[in-house]
């Protein structure tokens, strides 16, 4: 690209280094041993008596001690060789960056341009370019092999355990396999049930897959506004979000330096990056929706395709005939993109140019393998408006557009609400599957109540867990700042952790083969009072340690058999352990303690039933209780002495 240089220097500071008691590891797929698929291994204590636990890792090179991070140079461009190896692409100069791409920002507010520049690639001819086209042609790409290995969490086949987990879950028609193979990935993509968002110009990408038959994914939104944030803050928020588990990131910048901010993010992002191109297009016409044109919008698409954006939210379902359906709503049109297009349609009294030019948009996006995220511009902004005519009219149109995009060779996912009470959530999922041919569903929450500003990460996390269980493939996080302001670094982490909980809960309910391994490992650590393992197996070790240390800060408390909730005498798990320890000392009477309902059935010579094990055990323990003083809690030395006598 030809980029005008800027004399300023931007040096974003980002968080690096491993999470507590974790190390980066890589798995090599059998089908492509040259690939290095990242995992995070949680290191358990020596006393655990079980192997370390591998978990899915979205953090990229930022947690790899063998990689020197240079944000100014960007991440390694590993995928470039994969794309060129397949052929069917050409390198070209690309469009010149224009002042309006960054909002005509003045020199005093201009951010430094990213220094490393790469000529963009684009597809040529009729040869396969997109992952969908390769899948339909029966070709398994390196991206498909990569995500198959990633979904299996580096494990080889463990079919007995996997099949038991699947049998225990309720997947509502999803077909989660016991083991993910590259061929299964190819079939799901060819069918349109899954996508691998992977622009051929995002060479820094570590591929991931979105689909209802795979792990539920989460997205984190970042981006500046006209009143706050900077390039440095947004790059830092991106790295921070993926550290805690964001599978994709959307840059929703609406202020100055939009192009430059996006370039810095893309060159340093190992996860797919999504955008809403209409936001930047609006900035190019001074924020007036009436001035928008197809030509200006198309130019913005080209700009972002060349940079490497992996998926676009395009509100092509907001049609002129549907706008009046929102007139009686409590909250009208709450989508920014939806309201922009609604105003344009009414001002010109024309059908949306996104709808009328949709096939041209497909042809353009196909050249770069940019995936569609068909936007829900008429989503409900309050539970009073959930599942109304406007929402479902748009959804039906998105189903029609999905078929067009598929015919053009483009990957597609569908965006969903919004604000939906719990009893109406499954209706949304079922209708989306029906109308959109099982294309992956990607929802914002949904929020299940409107009464909790400041806590909408919780109101939406409830709905997110439910719709993820019902079949939603990716959940867009909501932070505590939703409806109140632009999220900061802490809000981003809170939103990501909340949605990791929701996604994992959905995976558990669906019976995903590997989901419960982490739960069980943490439960064993909890019962064994392995505090450090408890902290490290959790989604947020830092917060877990901080909460524990508020009341029990000493190192000795990290090995204590109690916490500050119950104390040493009332810990249920400690009492249970004591019971087990006692049962082990009973010798022949162990069965009486563990299985009190089993008893001899024979009568004695006089016809009187023999005492049951339970009766015998109860009498013995009653006598022993009295002998030892009749106290609920006893001196440990007395108990030991009594056990020796037994």
Swiss-Prot record:
GO aspect biological process, one term: thiamine diphosphate biosynthetic process
Reactions mediated catalytically: 5-amino-1-(5-phospho-beta-D-ribosyl)imidazole + S-adenosyl-L-methionine = 4-amino-2-methyl-5-(phosphooxymethyl)pyrimidine + CO + 5'-deoxyadenosine + formate + L-methionine + 3 H(+)
Matches recorded under Pfam families: ThiC-associated, ThiC_Rad_SAM
Required co-factors: [4Fe-4S] cluster
Keyword Lipoprotein: no
Residue ranges of the region described as Disordered: 1-30
Cofactor details (free text): Binds 1 [4Fe-4S] cluster per subunit. The cluster is coordinated with 3 cysteines and an exchangeable S-adenosyl-L-methionine.
Domain of life: Bacteria
Residues holding [4Fe-4S] cluster: 563, 566, 571
Biochemical pathway: Cofactor biosynthesis; thiamine diphosphate biosynthesis
InterPro entries referenced in this protein's UniProt entry, alphabetically: ThiC, ThiC-associated_dom, ThiC/Bza_core_dom, ThiC/BzaA/B
Binding site for Zn(2+): 419, 483
UniProt: substrate binding residues: 221, 250, 279, 315, 335-337, 376-379, 415, 442
A GO molecular function held by the record: zinc ion binding
Annotated EC: 4.1.99.17
Record-level GO cellular component terms: cytosol
Role summary: Catalyzes the synthesis of the hydroxymethylpyrimidine phosphate (HMP-P) moiety of thiamine from aminoimidazole ribotide (AIR) in a radical S-adenosyl-L-methionine (SAM)-dependent reaction.
Protein known as: Phosphomethylpyrimidine synthase
Designated gene of the protein: thiC
